[in-house]
A protein has these predicted regions:
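C-terminal, surface-exposed recognition/capping segments
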Residues: 96-99, 131-147, 153, 160-163, ...
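Short aromatic-cysteine micro-motif
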Residues: 2-168, 270
Length: 271
């Protein structure tokens, strides 16, 4: 068992979900893959062709709202995943949940052998956005599909350095997360924002605790302010062609539009 906080000590807010304190959460091992028949506009859209597994093309070209509603639809009655809505909550990754995973890479539970010796997570540099592909951190874009998640090369791109970690957090596609500046809807597709428990709202130009300000520039990972009305939504990790700028601590801003190099991932918590 892994204990993240000491007794009587408050956990980082990734483990607070609404009014509940979580002991943990399940984070998508790969970027969401599969297809959608059409963009999701509510929590009951058809997500029967959505998958979270290696060696598939990630789901892209969706606005933030479509990714969000797709993740929420995974627990609807009669879903193909076996989820029971009274037992679990499925949702799109929030920025602080990404941050919690990023922090763990910099620990003995991730890429560190001790308190001072850590290695960077490798990049998914596949030009077809195939999930679970990986190479060394500074590798250039490649069409090669043989560096799959269970090979020696691809384990470089795991958050733990072995097959049990999380993939596609460096490179692949830029991952939209539910983090926004001053509740600015912009081009996200939302008519109104969902319950606050499903997103992080930022009102200042810097913020610690979500692997943003305090880890800015680590491993030379790309960073750019999202604190503008034109790019209020967080995207994380970079994409396959960003080379050494890619990484779990990379972040940038976007309007929320349905870009071809934008993907997402989902999270499960107990209800």
């Amino acid at each position: 068992d892994v204990t993240f906080v000491k007794q009587n000590e408050t956990a980082i807010d990734a483990f607070t979900f609404g009014d509940k304190q979580l002991s943990g959460f399940w984070y998508g091992k790969f970027e969401i893959g599969g297809t959608l028949a059409s963009s999701c506009t509510n929590e009951t859209c058809n997500v029967s062709n959505i998958v979270v597994k290696p060696n598939v093309s990630s789901l892209r070209s969706q606005k933030v709202s479509s990714f969000f509603y797709a993740a929420r639809s995974m627990e609807q009655t009669g879903n193909s995943f076996g989820f029971v809505s009274s037992e679990v909550d499925t949702h799109m990754s929030k920025n602080n949940e990404w941050g919690a995973v990023a922090y763990l890479t910099q620990s003995i539970y991730g890429r560190c052998t001790n308190s001072t010796t850590c290695t960077e997570v490798g990049i998914n540099n596949n030009t077809s956005y195939i999930t679970g592909i990986g190479d060394k951190p500074s590798s250039t874009a490649s069409s090669v599909k043989t560096n799959t998640y269970n090979t020696i090369s691809e384990k470089n791109a795991s958050t733990t350095g072995n097959i049990y970690g999380i993939y596609d957090m460096s490179g692949g596609a830029w991952d939209y997360v539910m983090g926004v500046y001053k509740k600015t809807i912009s081009d996200s597709g939302f008519r109104s924002l969902p319950d606050i428990k499903y997103y992080n709202n930022y009102t200042e130009s810097s913020y610690t605790g979500h692997a943003i300000s305090e880890t800015k520039g680590w491993y030379n990972d790309q960073s750019f302010s999202v604190y503008f009305s034109v790019s209020p939504w967080f995207i994380r990790g970079c994409f396959y062609d960003d080379g050494e700028l890619s990484g779990v601590f990379a972040f940038y801003g976007s309007s929320g539009i349905n870009g071809n190099n934008r993907a997402s991932r989902f999270v499960i918590t107990n209800e």
